[in-house]
């Protein structure tokens, strides 16, 4: 589904992403892990098109997207959530999701019209709210949601584009155990119908969710494989996981 060929990015003399080859297969939850500063978020930005690459190719569904704009990648079926929550904080949950649906469909939208006048737009927004466990929060202002609820809303914004591949950049960042549990369950539900490329530091979540894992260290992929193989890989343990996860 997604294939990266020798993808690279430099910032001055620093090589943030170094000739990365990566394949994400349709239907999988593919986790990308690595220490802080490994280049994970930069790599996600290159895939999403919010940052230009210096070298290499991005192939998605047999189309080359390397030099396309972010909106063209969204139209092709790529959606992204961010490491730092990115929502319309002054709008309600319903209006956030309706805006995302409208952006995808191109239908007209006005906050000054009654809800009933927008019909299907808000029906779909409510369905997405239910999908991300925010059905009872549709009237709440986004800024008043808990951190975990805001992250779930951001995932909902990504789902509103009807993606074929979702890029999730540390969706559990800053969450407590209960919020993390809910996010894991949400990603499990998403992964049943949408391919997911997941960047995450919570190793318990990664090993529960991922069908395959790639390890990025100093901008390079050092290993890719099933969770059991990654857990047992001596090079991975030395570089990232730690000997305590070897058992």
Walk through the language-model features, giving the residues of each.
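Glycine-rich phosphate-binding loops of nucleotide-dependent enzymes
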Residues: 1-247
């Amino acid at each position: 589904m997604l294939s990266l060929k020798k993808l690279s990015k430099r910032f001055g003399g620093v090589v943030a992403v170094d000739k990365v080859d990566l394949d994400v297969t349709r239907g999988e939850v593919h986790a990308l892990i690595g220490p802080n500063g490994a280049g994970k978020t930069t790599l996600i930005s290159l895939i999403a098109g919010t940052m230009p690459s210096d070298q290499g190719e991005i192939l998605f569904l047999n189309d080359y997207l390397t030099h396309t704009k972010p909106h063209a990648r969204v139209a092709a079926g790529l959606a992204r959530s961010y490491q730092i929550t990115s929502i319309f904080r002054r709008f309600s949950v319903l209006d956030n999701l309706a805006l995302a649906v409208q952006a995808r469909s191109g239908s007209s939208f006005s906050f000054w019209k009654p809800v009933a006048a927008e019909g299907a737009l808000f029906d779909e927004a409510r369905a997405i709210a239910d999908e991300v466990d925010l059905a009872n929060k549709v009237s709440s202002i986004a800024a008043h949601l808990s951190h975990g609820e805001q992250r779930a809303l951001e995932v909902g914004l990504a789902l509103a584009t009807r993606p074929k591949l979702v890029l999730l950049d540390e969706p559990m960042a800053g969450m407590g155990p209960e919020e993390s549990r809910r996010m894991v369950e949400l990603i499990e539900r998403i992964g049943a119908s949408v391919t997911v490329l997941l960047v995450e530091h919570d190793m318990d979540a990664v090993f529960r969710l991922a069908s395959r894992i790639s390890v990025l260290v100093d901008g390079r992929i050092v290993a890719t494989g099933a969770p059991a193989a990654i857990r047992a890989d001596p090079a991975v343990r030395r570089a990232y996981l730690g000997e305590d996860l070897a058992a």
